[in-house]
Structure formats: C-alpha cells, structure tokens
Amino acid sequence: ADAFVSAGSTGAILVGGQLIVGRIKGIERPPLAPLIPTKDGVALLIDCGANVDARPSHLVQFAQLGSIYMENVVGVKNPRVGIVNIGAEEEKGNALVKETFPLLKECTGIRFIGSVEARDIPQGVCDVVVSEAFVGNVILKLYEGVGATLISKVKSGMMTSLRSKIGALLVKPALKETLKSFDASQYGGAPLLGLNGLVVKSHGSSNAVEIKNSIIQCVQFKQQKINEKIKENIILKQ
C-alpha cells in the first residue's frame, strides 16, 4: 500500500508509524498536522497531538515540515509561519517558546512572522501555526467545538419564525458554503509528517465524508511527492 488511513487510537498510530514505516532520516519527532479554517482559507496546525514533550529543535522542524506541506499540497507560496504564544512580543511565553523563537528567526527556508495569539489564528494571520502537542490539541478541539456549535445555532436560528425562514432561503447558497468551512469533516485527517510513508490520522468519530477526504489527502500527498521534497528541503541542524 502507498498510504495508511485510520480513525483508531492516536498512540497506536504514532507508535506503529514510527516502528513499521520509520522516520525520514534526520526527523526527530513526526508531528500531526491538520488543516483548520481561517477567514480567507486554511492554515496548518502543527503539532496537534503527537509530541507533548517537544523541544525547541522539534518545533523548528515542525515549521519546516509545515512550510513544505502548505506550499506543495495546499499551494500557498512562501507560507507565513507563526508560533503560538500568549502575546505578540518576543520576550513573552513559556521556556519552550522563548527558546524556540530565536531559532525560528534564524532558520532559513521558512518565512517566520513571529508570535501568534490564539485569537488571531482564525483571522488567517499565518499559514503554518507551530505549537507543541498539548497546546495544539486544545486549539484543535476548541475549533471543532465552536464550529459544531456555530452550525447548530445558525440552523436553529433560521427556524424561529416565518421571516427567518424566508431570509434563510434567500441566503442559503452562501450560508451553506460558509457553514461548510466550519465542518471539520471537510478537511480530512491529520497527516503524520516526517515518516518514510504516508500515514493519516482521522478523528475517532469520523463520518464517511472525513474518511473520503482523508483518502483524497493521501492522493494529493503522493502526487506532489511530499516525502521526496521533505528529504530535499529539510534543514537538519540549526
């Protein structure tokens, strides 16, 4: 097989992927990297659940992997990279963020724009959102929860009166597309980047649409020869 898609245990997929498929030479920790919606398109959240004890060198590689993926799979030229922080200033953040920041500034091959606060992520201020897995997973789950709540609230609000029902009919096409962008199943799963093969982790509660889109991800990944480009472009030492 050229690819593996699973909605099973994240831990089992991580261990199996590294032991059976193996890491690309020089990759320290393969991260999970799902696409998330933004005001003008999508961003890549990396890492969202694979490495809760990440080191600065890991986050630098996440930035490189994310840039390669966004440019070659999503088609974003010279993608902007930001690191999740509690403020925009360079001196803010925990020890991990403070140690990683100067490394990202010095890293060639990426377009680092600095710290990004969580509230700015949906605004599309960057194309690659770098974090360790704990923070990334919290962001991802909040996205999923807010998206599901928003869709539910809008649908129920449209049925409250005859006027709202008529209004809903008038804006239905545009509204449908907008709400679709908040549906996590539209983006497929999260590729485990940095492996010698292609492994995609879908949500444990995935429906048929998400599995289908995860398979489409695999096709795009394979067609664009992402692993070959990672091997060619990854900078192993900072």
Question: What name fits each language-model region?
Answer:
Residues 52-118, 127-128, 132, 144:
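Glycine-rich phosphate/diphosphate-binding loop of Rossmann-like nucleotide-binding domains
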Residues 1, 50-55, 115-122, 186-187:
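Glycine-rich oxoanion-binding loops at beta->alpha junctions
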Residues 9-12, 86-89, 118, 134-137, ...:
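Short glycine-rich anion-binding loops that position phosphate/pyrophosphate groups of nucleotides
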